[in-house]
Amino acid sequence: MFNWNIVAQLLSLALVTLSGPAVIFLLYFKRGNL
């Protein structure tokens, strides 16, 4: 049977990995605009 716990952990890890640089880029972009 499929283990959803591992899938949830991988998805959350991927979200954190992708959202980290995205937030930094957005903050830098907004500061650069001002």
UniProtKB/Swiss-Prot annotation:
GO terms for cellular component: chloroplast thylakoid membrane; photosystem II. Its main location: plastid. It comes from the Eukaryota. Keywords: Chloroplast, Membrane, Photosynthesis, Photosystem II, Plastid, Thylakoid, Transmembrane, Transmembrane helix. It is found in: Plastid, Chloroplast thylakoid membrane. The chain crosses the membrane at residues 6-26. One of its GO terms (biological process) is photosynthesis. It holds the Pfam family PSII_Ycf12. It is a single-pass membrane protein. A core subunit of photosystem II (PSII), probably helps stabilize the reaction center. PSII is composed of 1 copy each of membrane proteins PsbA, PsbB, PsbC, PsbD, PsbE, PsbF, PsbH, PsbI, PsbJ, PsbK, PsbL, PsbM, PsbT, PsbX, PsbY, PsbZ, Psb30/Ycf12, peripheral proteins of the oxygen-evolving complex and a large number of cofactors. It forms dimeric complexes. NCBIfam families: PRK13686.1. Belongs to the Psb30/Ycf12 family. This is Photosystem II reaction center protein Psb30. The lineage of its organism: Eukaryota, Haptista, Haptophyta, Prymnesiophyceae, Isochrysidales. The gene is psb30.
